[in-house]
Amino acid sequence: MSNSKPLSLTDAVTTWYMKKLKSKPIQTKALTSATLSFISSVVAQKFIEKKKINWNAVVKFTVWGLISSPLVHYWHIILDRLFKNIKDKYQSWGKLIVDQLVFAPFINIAFYSVLAILDGKPKSILFKLYFDLFPTLKASWKVWPLAQLINFRFVPSHLRVLFGNLVGFCWGIYLSILATKKRN
């Protein structure tokens, strides 16, 4: 008979998730991101905008979550390699600067491009970027630098995408509202 007590539901789910993260990191991160994107879109529409759920928008935002997570996964690998020989105290700041000046514009361009394609309006990409990219970046720079500094400084590398997903849940609500307003 074992002296260990049975795992709580939280412990069991955490253990299962960590195993999946190790055995299938990209799929696990993509499905996590898609799930949180789905939930954030529903929350934004139903509880913040207080309107009937536009399931078409929810599906598009969920697809975005599925696509974006692998990009973020590989971005973190690139950052880790770029800054591997830098002292710890400078590493986080270096990653933050490169992340916000290179990846933030890239991921937001990708966001608007993917949504335009999913809307069946690929010709509107440049128009959307012209009007929406800088306001979105300005808004993101109010949230993501602090979140990413915490992420780069304190979160183990295998959990950084998950941490970003959790911050992104709130950010996703904002983006979902923004994307829905821009489409209407």
UniProtKB/Swiss-Prot annotation:
Membrane disposition: Multi-pass membrane protein
Keyword Aminoacyl-tRNA synthetase in annotation: no
Subcellular location: Membrane
Signal peptide: 1-44
Membrane-spanning parts: 58-78, 97-117, 159-179
Primary location class: membrane
Cellular component terms per the entry's GO annotation: cytoplasm; peroxisomal membrane
Key words, A-Z: Membrane, Signal, Transmembrane, Transmembrane helix
Entry's family note: Belongs to the peroxisomal membrane protein PXMP2/4 family.
Name of the protein: PXMP2/4 family protein 3
Organism field: Dictyostelium discoideum (Social amoeba)
